[in-house]
Amino acid sequence: MNYNFNWTVIEKNIVPMLEGLGFGLLMAIIAITVGTIIGLLLAFAAVSKSKIARKLVQIFVTIFRNTPILILVYITYFGMPTIGINIPKVPSFVITLALYSSAYMEEVFRAGLEAIPKGIIEAGQAIGLSGTVIKIEIELPIMMKKVLPSMGNYLISLFKDTSIASAITVGELTYISKVLTTQTFRVFEVW
């Protein structure tokens, strides 16, 4: 079988492909930003003294980490309208991705918080700092240094997860590539 590559398909469609790439990156950045904030709050709740808070975080993290993201996307996009909540496809996907990422970020941040030596926290308490000041001024900077590599790795993984948006016809790179493949029959060049 002889296959003749035709790279003009890419040349003619580079703009929509780059737009899809940019849109996927934008969705990933929004989701990781929101997910990081929620994950940080969940991590502080996970290491708090409140048993109820710890248990609620554990349930949330267990559900979101153990459910495939495609199922979560389908529940958000197709399931929510059955109970009267209609969310457009892009916000639906970004919300799902943000909650999904917050469960993973919570684990990263919790590990970072647990790696902080207790003596540093006790030193802050000894000089009269409040619990909030200790968390913001002492724990947060130390933890961020420890978790930054994991966060970078997860951002890359989350960007790859944006391809799942094509399942609900969000126009990111994977969806645009599928459309181009259907229109041009140039599978190898597009992918």
PLM feature spans:
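Transmembrane alpha-helices and adjacent helix-loop boundaries
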Residues: M1-W191
